[in-house]
């Protein structure tokens, strides 16, 4: 499995969404690097980017493959995990399965309900549109407009740098196979019903028409240490729509993870 490994310190696993690759999460790296003391491992999920699909045929298979790769790379060392969209669903599963090893969980626009028809989502909304910037995108404009809520030149440039390369690198046959078995065997909060007590962050776009925000809120009592932020003027790629705010929330979450770990070490 292809993984970009940056920095030194406690492992921080980053899992992207469906149909893109690790580059979609690289805009977070300056904030993560500034936080210090974190070894950032950006995964290309099987069938995405530079990772072959291999024998993965379902979301459950993919979660098991990612978990095995984590074990290979970090062993029994405690780690934190960030998941975006589909990667947020996988991150929740891993965080619950490895509770004793996971320092904290951050979910950016996570898939909470796998079946699209059962999700509660707002209507598609565009907050800002720069027609000149859209025209300059050419053939890419269609895929950009599908997700972008703040359609500015800066936002379009971020899409071209971080989202579009993964869209073109993905294996269409692999994605089709995975889409047929997109659900986990059980939702993590049901399979492991005890509250998840490590520092947690849910950050979701108010205008996210892909996963919405209501389904995540339904699980808030399961996460007693969670910050839950619904961000205006932000859609499914909210870290591109509102980069400064999302980076600040991630930085604050990492501070909570660090304090929680230090407290436990002190009283162990």
Task: Place the predicted regions along the sequence by residue.
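Conserved HGGG/HGGXW glycine-rich cap/lid loop of the alpha/beta-hydrolase fold
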Residues: 2-52
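Conserved alpha/beta-hydrolase "acid-adjacent" motif
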Residues: 209-215
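Conserved alpha/beta-hydrolase catalytic His-Asp/Glu region
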Residues: 116-118, 136-194
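Active-site loop/oxyanion-hole signature of alpha/beta-hydrolase fold enzymes
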Residues: 39-82, 248-251
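Gly/Ala-rich beta-loop-alpha elbow adjacent to hydrolase catalytic centers
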Residues: 83, 87, 91
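Flexible "cap/lid" loop of the alpha/beta hydrolase fold
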Residues: 92, 96, 102-135
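Short beta-strand/loop motif that positions the catalytic acidic residue
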Residues: 196, 202-204, 208
């Amino acid at each position: 499995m292809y993984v970009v490994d940056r920095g030194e310190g406690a492992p921080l696993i980053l899992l992207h969404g469906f149909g893109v690759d690790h580059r979609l999460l690289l805009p977070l790296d300056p904030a993560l690097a500034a936080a210090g003391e974190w070894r950032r491992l950006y995964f290309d999920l099987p069938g995405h980017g530079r990772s072959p699909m291999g024998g993965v045929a379902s979301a459950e298979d993919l979660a098991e493959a990612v978990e095995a790769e984590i074990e290979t790379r970090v062993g029994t060392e405690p780690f934190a995990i960030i998941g975006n969209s589909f990667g947020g669903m996988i991150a929740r599963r891993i965080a619950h399965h490895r509770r004793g090893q996971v320092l904290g969980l951050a979910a950016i626009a996570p898939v909470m309900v796998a079946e699209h028809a059962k999700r509660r989502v707002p209507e598609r909304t565009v907050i800002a549109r720069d027609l000149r910037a859209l025209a300059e995108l050419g053939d890419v404009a269609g895929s950009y407009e599908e997700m972008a809520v703040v359609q500015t030149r800066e936002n379009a440039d971020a899409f071209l740098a971080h989202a579009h390369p993964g869209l073109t690198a993905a294996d269409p046959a692999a994605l089709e196979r995975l889409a047929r078995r997109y659900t986990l065997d059980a939702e993590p909060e049901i399979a492991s019903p005890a509250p998840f007590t490590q520092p947690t962050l849910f950050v979701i776009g108010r205008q996210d028409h892909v996963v919405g925000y209501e389904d995540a809120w339904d699980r808030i009592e399961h996460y007693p240490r969670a910050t839950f932020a619904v961000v205006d003027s932000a859609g499914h790629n909210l870290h591109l729509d509102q980069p400064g705010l999302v980076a600040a929330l991630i930085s604050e979450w990492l501070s909570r993870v660090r304090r929680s770990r230090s407290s436990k070490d002190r009283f162990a």
